[in-house]
From Swiss-Prot:
Might have a zinc-finger. CDD domains: DEXHc_HFM1, SF2_C_Ski2. Its cofactor is Zn(2+). Residues 1311-1327 have a biased composition (Polar residues). A zinc finger (C4-type) spans 1141-1156. It comes from Mus musculus (Mouse). Belongs to the helicase family. SKI2 subfamily. Disulfide bonds: none annotated. Pfam families: DEAD (PF00270), Helicase_C (PF00271), Sec63 (PF02889), SNRNP200_wHTH (PF23445). This is Probable ATP-dependent DNA helicase HFM1. InterPro entries: DEAD/DEAH_box_helicase_dom, Helicase_ATP-bd, Helicase_C-like, Meiotic_Crossover_Helicase, P-loop_NTPase, Sec63-dom, WH-like_DNA-bd_sf, WH_DNA-bd_sf. The gene is Hfm1. A motif (DEAH box) lies at residues 410-413. It catalyses: Couples ATP hydrolysis with the unwinding of duplex DNA by translocating in the 3'-5' direction; ATP + H2O = ADP + phosphate + H(+).
């Protein structure tokens, strides 16, 4: 008698019944080949309702209602059978002499349930009853004939039934297992053929044929269905040794009765979702009724690889059946713990549910928040807990969240994970809260949210079911143990000795030499997958294995591996691949990874080493999985794998699509062996980790107004898994084990109150005396941007003067980057990026070498912003991850600083840094073209090398030249120019309103969009592009901040705002900045000086610098913001007494110039003797020189042809009367141009001579006779006159308007105009109506060494020269006189001509001497000639 536990069948197997031992098999046998037809299409399978109606017509149902479900031992859903190729045959020894016909009408009524189309596994007793129906009397029963006639009349009604009735004529390839089968059909009289299978021919495909086992031509389960003997013949087969029985274990229950649901129970329009199989497997069939015919919450715990995904698809089908078309107000959320699973599910469901009419959208960390607009129209949202947490923190603003009807949770056992678990727990609790609040707010009862959760095998699944209750009753919980696993998995834990002195690194290296013995013992010459903890460990282990072992591979397989190795970029991988060993990790090139995955899937690669990337969702055909070392490097330290990681890795073994049996081996230390034995036995209870991360989630709920006081906070805690587990296991959460329910609730409430006080300490929430909570703006920003509490705490301590470098350093140390690891192999590249004299390095190098995670993050951020290429692929991946989180932190920081009313410098730098993260460029980068479409880093570098460093230059360039530069065909250049032309072009105007006060002023700021008419038709910038206006004063206080949308400017072309300004203590200067949100190169930075009544600390001047493309470094901006002023300005020349200024303002009462309103005040007189100034100048020039005096004298004497110095002595001549200078000492001081705070540019300007101004006048008489000039070589003064020609060239080359001044407004004693007429003409030129105000340029002093340049009209020059010659005819020698007149004739008649005062050369440095202050016009030239004698001497 066969036993019930012998009934193990392959899912592709024909349904054989065990032979009757009383039967005699004749010796004469004939070999017969049996072929199976291809599987019928799903559309050909009739509905169960149709079959039931047909059975009713036979009147065979009797009293009992026929069950709706079909039972079969066919292959489970979504998993292909493990079988041989379709070309292989199974040979049966067929006895032609023994044929018996069985009429269904003669069967026992107690065993007639099979007639309803139900395929049943029967117990031994039922087997006997059924076999006993084959008596002759039963065959000759009158009922048989009647049933036969009826069946013949209906034979042509169904193509499907005709197909089932045909003799099998196709090849069938499958494995047979032990057991007996009873198969009956109601369609027609079925011939029962007793067949004996010879032992030598029974099996043509053994398990040794592994290549076929992993063939890509996988046999479908519906092929077995059509070939199962329903058509005509039923075979009786003897028992076989169980070779492949584990994958048929489903369908067997302890009672001997199991049933499988048919796909035909699904409505016809949804059957294509399950088109891969005709029947659901045992686990899915057990959950079928609860999922498809009820709306209750559902939790299922089943082994990995048991087809749990179909559980979700059944729940979706139920919702589609209930909700009418067009499904607009219905959303389904699928949540998985990792992005790899989300991506896999998205690709799968997009194909399955797309034809049905559902729109799928993936929402993970790789997607930006802009995708929220797209998920508004998505029906199925596939996301991670972290991403859905950030979305639902604004659920009151996002109405689509209230449209969620079905919430699917994959891998719900992740709730016990320290990092991911709290987020998963809070998200599910929040979705329950959304449902309850919606029920309270709406009068009509809203449609509830259904929760369906899937978990690996865990001991306390009832706790999860209780947590997912609908408020009235817990969720339905279905627990399936390992006995129902489709593929039997053998789990082995191997412990290896590890001494206390041995590091984890050395232990991991030692395991590399033990991997081969594990593979040889457990792989059974089938594909093996080895998980390693690090990327470097993967390469090392593969290299060791290649040296130790040679895997037997066929010649064809070796040729395929060698051919694939040619395409591999990784040289080490190329060496190991030809020996049948490969490796795979996230740091490899994508092409290499795909190629290795393909080789392993096809079976050509026997061994694959990998990191955790393949453990999460990748379905690889591994018979053996080896976890080499249970320690991995995370967060800077070695720690044990979590249970979730272990289960995911061993879940890669024995996938039903590829294998029948599988083995998982864990290699660990002896000390931890027992821990993993218990873990694999699924004895670890799922506990909550929410109590360790409660503070961020409490803040989020307060922002959502879910929690308003302590009592409601406790109510919210009751909706979490933490509360359920704390009641059952209080000691795990730090509570006393003897506490009752009230005591535990009090402890939880105390825990909440502690975290709430921490939030209140940082002003994230407001608490009153009644312990009521209200969120603050800072708390809202923390919740909305998903920022950790520690990060907020770090930035709350900012001083307000932080530079860009400071902010980047603070961001790099945030907890959001804890998952970034610093690998030893990366340090060389990072140090090269940081400091390298031969390469382009980062903008703000770090003093030390790269040693920490924070330094790595800092370096990669700066490298990306500086457009420095990073060659290492792993570092490139890390950079993408860093910028994803860093951009979010920077956006939060700019909003946080603005909300906290922090200082101006840190606000401006945070806004600029936000834009830098978005554009991935520095704010002063020359690679502005990289922001345009079709321009990458390579083309951008080409444009920078060609000098196209701004949008203005690109727009002015010729389109054909652009194409030549970029090596592109037309119309590429035209497209680039059009893109630039349609960028917004801002213009900023500031003026002061004529209402003055000593502490307050009013300014009018106007922002003009110059090309707003052009932007009406086309825009390059996105629709939501805006510019931020930030105004700050010299005290580092924010005066004004506002975001101006482009859409506002497009309406009228401008935006005007009146702003009240309070007087600053340090200076009246304002810094006005317009920062684009999306583009580098559009910013405007401008200075404006406000006028106030009352005493002033600084020289009153208006300084305005306008730049459409910023070129200033904001890293030291806070220093400039608080300085006395850093702008370039120009003060007009002044006459004695009050007078009107010469600004050409249209409305002098409304402009920002204070001199336009009150006039120009008279400068104080400076009484200083000529000799004192002269000696001061000599001292200054002598101090500047870098050469010793003796050496300089020697050089100059050689140049002067050894002139005797005695000839230059000062000889008093009584014949020349002394000229009194006292009458000239009261000459009013002439105002000059001032340049302030430019030490870094004008570092060589000397301030020493100014100390002589107030000294007593020296009564020294210094005169020279005419014979001094007669003896002096006139050629020594040629250099002086050539300098005047240089000034003329300077004016013609575009520097004619350049005016310079001394440092900090201090006036050197000789920095005056050369004559009185020059002074008068200088004033007249400044007041010319045709000349606008000029701005200082940096190049004047650095290029020419000038400190004062006065413009002289030609007519004044001619008159002055004639006057000078008439008054002092004997002052100059004839040579000098001819030179002066020749120079005056060559001067062009241009108002831009500059006449430069005479200079005295001194070892490369020239010093200007202006004597017009101390002498009358006729005596000034005499003194200049005197000083020219000493050219080069001092």
């Amino acid at each position: 008698m066969p036993k019930s536990d012998d009934c193990f069948f392959s899912m592709d197997n024909l349904f054989f019944s065990s032979p009757d031992e009383t039967e005699n098999f004749p010796v004469k046998e004939k070999s017969l080949d049996w072929f199976l037809p291809p599987a019928p299409l799903i559309s050909e399978i009739p509905d169960i309702q149709e079959l039931e109606e047909e059975i009713e017509s036979y009147k065979l149902l009797g009293k009992g209602k026929m069950p709706r479900m079909l039972t079969s031992n066919l292959k489970i859903i979504n998993e292909d059978t493990n079988c041989i190729s379709p070309t292989q045959k199974i040979h049966f020894s067929y006895n032609v002499h023994e044929q018996d016909y069985l009429n269904l009408g003669g069967s026992n009524n107690n065993d007639m349930s099979h007639v309803a189309g139900k395929l049943m596994y029967g117990s031994s007793q039922k087997y006997k009853n059924h076999m006993g129906a084959k008596s002759p009397s039963a065959r000759s029963s009158p009922g048989d004939t009647k049933l036969h006639d009826v069946a013949e009349d209906r034979q042509g009604t169904s193509a499907f039934k005709k197909r089932l009735s045909r003799t099998c004529d196709s090849e069938h390839d499958c494995d047979y297992a032990d057991g007996s089968l009873n198969l009956s059909s109601h369609i027609s009289p079925v011939k029962l053929t007793q067949t004996k299978i010879s032992k030598e021919n029974a099996w043509t495909c053994s398990n040794s044929k592994q290549k076929r086992q992993y063939s890509t031509n996988k046999f479908k389960a519906n092929d077995a269905f059509s070939a199962s003997g329903i058509g005509k013949d039923i075979f009786k087969a003897p028992s076989f040794p169980a070779a492949s029985q584990p994958h048929d274990i489903q369908g067997i229950t302890p009672n001997g009765l199991g049933s499988l649901k048919a796909v035909t129970e699904i409505p016809a329009k949804f059957r294509n979702i399950f088109k891969e199989f005709p029947y659901f497997n045992y686990i899915q069939s057990k959950a079928f009724d609860d999922l498809l015919y009820t709306d209750r919450n559902f939790v299922i715990c089943a082994p990995t690889g048991s087809g749990k995904t179909v559980v979700f698809e059944l729940a979706i089908t139920r919702l589609l059946m209930e909700v009418p078309l067009p499904w607009l107000n219905m959303k389904i959320v699928y949540m998985a713990p990792i992005k790899a699973l989300c991506s896999q599910r998205f690709d799968d469901w997009k194909e399955k549910f797309g034809p049905v009419g559902l729109n799928c959208k993936e929402l993970t960390g790789d997607t930006v928040m802009d995708d929220l607009f797209e998920i508004q129209h998505a029906n199925i949202i596939i996301t991670t807990p972290e991403k859905w947490d950030s979305v639902t923190r604004k659920w009151r603003d996002n109405s689509f969240i209230q449209l969620v009807r079905l919430f699917l949770i994959d891998e719900v056992h992740v709730i016990k994970d320290e990092n991911r678990g709290p987020t998963l727990e809070v998200v599910v609790s929040r979705m329950k809260t959304v449902q309850s609040l919606s029920r309270d707010l709406e009068s009509a009862s809203p449609v509830p949210v259904r929760f369906v959760a899937v978990s690996a095998t865990i001991p306390n699944a009832e706790d999860i079911a209780e947590w997912l209750s609908d408020g009235e009753r817990p969720a339905v919980c279905l627990k399936m143990d390992e006995s129902h696993r489709p593929v039997k998995l053998q789990k082995v834990v191997l412990g290896f000795p590890c001494s206390s002195s041995q590091t984890e690194f050395k232990f991991d290296l030692a395991l590399n030499y033990k991997v081969y013995s594990v593979i040889r013992t457990y792989s059974d010459q089938k594909p093996t997958l080895v998980f390693c903890s690090t990327r470097k460990g993967v390469q090392q282990a593969a290299s060791v294995l290649v040296k130790d072992a040679k895997f037997i591979i066929s010649v064809e397989q070796k040729l395929r591996l060698q051919k694939s190795a040619y395409s591999i970029r990784d040289s080490k991988l190329k060496d190991t691949l030809v020996y049948g060993v490969g490796y795979h990790h996230a740091g490899m090139e994508l092409s290499d990874r795909k190629l290795v995955e393909g080789l392993f899937t096809s079976g050509d690669l026997p061994v694959l080493f990998t990191t955790s990337t393949l453990a999460m969702g990748m379905n690889m055909p591994a018979h053996l999985v080896v976890i080499k070392s249970t320690m991995h490097y995370s967060g800077g330290v070695f720690e044990e794998y979590s249970e979730t990681d272990i289960l995911q890795m061993i879940g890669r073994a024995g996938r039903p699509q590829f294998d029948t049996t599988a083995t998982a081996v864990i290699m660990t230390r002896l000390s931890t062996r027992e821990k993993y034995v218990q873990m694999l036995a699924c004895n670890d209870t799922v506990e909550s980790s929410l109590h360790r991360h409660l503070i961020e989630h409490l803040n989020a709920e307060i922002v959502l107004h879910t929690i308003t006081d302590v009592n409601i906070a406790l109510d919210w805690i009751r909706s979490t898994m933490l509360y359920i587990r704390a009641l059952k296991n209080p000691s795990h959460y730090g509570f006393s084990s003897g506490l009752n329910k009230d005591g535990i609730e009090a402890k939880l409430q105390e825990l909440c109150l502690k975290n709430l006080k921490d939030l209140s300490s940082l002003d994230l929430i407001k608490m009153d005396e009644d312990v009521n909570f209200k969120p603050t703006e800072a708390g809202r920003l923390m919740a909305w941007y998903y920022i950790t509490f520690e990060t907020v705490k770090k930035f709350c301590a900012i001083s307000g003067k932080e530079t860009l470098l400071d902010l980047i350093s603070m961001i790099s140390s945030c907890n959001e980057f804890l998952d970034v690891q610093l690998r030893i192999s990366e340090k060389r590249i990072l140090n090269t990026l940081n400091k390298d004299p031969n390469r382009i390095t980062i903008r703000f190098p770090m003093a030390e070498r790269i040693k920490t995670r924070e330094m790595k993050v800092n370096c990669l951020i700066q490298a990306q912003l500086g457009c420095i290429p990073i060659q290492d692929f792993a570092l490139t991946q890390d950079t993408v991850k860093i910028f994803r989180n860093g951009s979010r932190i920077a956006r939060w920081l700019s909003d946080f600083v603005a909300a906290q009313e922090k200082k101006f410098a840190v606000l401006l730098n945070s806004v600029i840094l936000t834009k830098c993260f978005k554009c991935k460029l520095w704010e002063n980068s020359k690679h502005v073209s990289k922001q345009l479409d079709k321009i990458g880093i390579s083309l951008s570098n080409t444009m920078v090398n060609a000098g196209l460093t701004s949008f203005k230059k690109i727009e002015e360039a010729n389109a054909r030249e652009l194409e030549l530069i970029l090596n592109r065909h037309p119309p590429f250049g035209t497209q680039i120019k059009e893109a630039v032309a349609h960028l917004p072009k801002y213009e900023l105007e500031v003026e002061q309103i004529a209402r003055y006060s000593d502490i307050k002023a009013e300014i009018l700021v106007t922002i003009i969009l110059r090309n707003f008419e052009q932007l009406q038709t086309k825009r390059t910038a996105p629709d939501f592009h805006y510019a931020t206006l930030i105004i700050g004063d010299a005290d580092n206080q924010v005066v004004f901040k506002h975001k101006i949308m482009d859409s506002v400017l497009l309406k009228s072309g401008n935006w005007v705002k009146k702003i009240d300004v309070k007087r600053a203590l340090i200076s009246e200067d304002l810094s006005i900045n317009l920062i684009s949100s999306d583009y580098v190169g559009l910013d405007i930075h401008q200075k404006f000086t406000v006028f106030y009544f009352g005493p002033r600390k600084f020289v009153n001047e208006t300084a305005m610098e306008r730049s459409s493309e910023t070129d200033i470094s904001h890293s030291d901006y806070s220093g400039r913001a608080t300085a006395t002023g850093s702008s370039k300005g120009m003060a007009t020349c002044k006459k004695p007494g009050n007078r009107e200024c010469h600004h050409h303002c249209k409305n002098k009462h409304a402009c920002g110039h204070d001199c336009c309103k009150i006039g120009v005040a008279q400068k104080p007189e400076v009484k200083e003797s000529a000799m004192s100034s002269y000696l001061s100048d000599l001292k200054s020039r002598d101090a500047v020189s870098s050469l010793p005096l003796a050496k300089r004298l020697k050089i100059q004497m050689n140049k002067s042809q050894n002139v005797d110095l005695k000839e230059f002595g000062f000889t008093p001549r009584p014949s020349l009367s002394s000229i009194s200078r006292s009458e000239y000492l009261n000459t009013p001081e002439l105002s000059i141009l001032e340049q302030r705070n430019q030490h870094e540019i004008y570092g060589k300007v000397q301030q020493g001579p100014s100390e002589y101004r107030d000294k007593e006048v020296l009564g020294v008489n210094l005169e020279l006779g005419n014979e001094v000039w007669d003896d002096f070589d006139d050629e020594s003064l040629i250099e002086v006159m050539s300098l005047s020609a240089d000034a003329e060239k300077m004016a013609a080359s575009g520097f004619g308007d350049t005016r310079d001044s001394s440092l900090g407004g201090s006036k050197l004693p000789f920095q005056k105009s050369s004559s009185r007429f020059q002074r008068d003409n200088s004033n007249s030129f400044a007041s010319s109506p045709g000349k606008p105000d000029a701005y200082l340029r940096d190049c004047s002093r650095s290029s020419f060494g000038l400190s004062s340049v006065a413009e002289i009209p030609q007519r004044a020059e001619n008159a002055s020269l004639a006057n000078l010659q008439e008054r002092r005819p004997l002052t100059l020698s004839p040579v000098i006189e001819r030179m002066c007149f020749a120079h005056s004739k060559k001067t062009p008649q241009s108002p831009k001509f500059k006449e430069v005062d005479i200079f005295i050369g001194n070892s490369g440095s020239k010093k200007e001497i202006d004597l017009s202050k101390y002498y009358p016009d006729d005596a000034a030239e005499e003194m200049k000639a005197l000083l020219g004698i000493f050219n080069g001497i001092f």
